[in-house]
Amino acid sequence: KGEGFSVGGGYNTRNNELGQKSLTTAIVGATMDIGPGTLSGQYATIKDNNPSDLSTIAAGLAANPATAPVATLVQNAFIQGFRQDAHLYQIGYRLTSGPHTVAVAYNNMDDRRPFNADRYSYGAAYTYALSKRTDLNAVVTHLENKNTSQDLLGGNGFLGGVASAPGKDVNSVTLSIRHRF
């Protein structure tokens, strides 16, 4: 961290229960004081061709004569469904003045799997500090699901579930009070 800016990065990889290379993530982010606020940005890659803890599905299904014929198909469907290959881009600006904090942000998830479940969202948040431990919050967020993406917004604009249909856009308005004990 420097005077008016910071830069950071990380890399993580693991093997699944079969010893295959599994989830791998790489991330780089930076902040810079611009004007009265702070600009932040982040880029991440997420890759997982061999998801963890799925290798025993077929064996469990094969034990039952009714499901044995489809055991391998079911396991392969789970593996395909849990694979990840995406690039994530985020940018935001935060301004604090006295008890007031305003933040705006945009993010874009570029899904590189055959599903092509791309999505992007943007939003704004306002926080008013009633005291050092209590604040009021208002958050407005729009999430645009593309193709097969079905993300749903939860509290304060974070992901919170599954939309009712693929490609369905969602909006969120959250009003809250927070007290830290």
For each feature predicted by the language model, list its residue ranges.
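Residues on the lipid-exposed face of transmembrane beta-strands in outer-membrane beta-barrel proteins
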Residues: 1-2, 28-32, 91-95, 124-128, ...
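Outer membrane beta-barrel
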Residues: 1-6, 32, 142-145
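Solvent-exposed loop segments that connect transmembrane elements
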Residues: 14-21, 46-86, 109-116, 143-169
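Acidic, glycine-rich loop-and-beta core segments that form the ion-binding/anion-interacting portion
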Residues: 23-28, 32-37
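C-terminal hydrophobic structural anchor segments
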Residues: 97-149
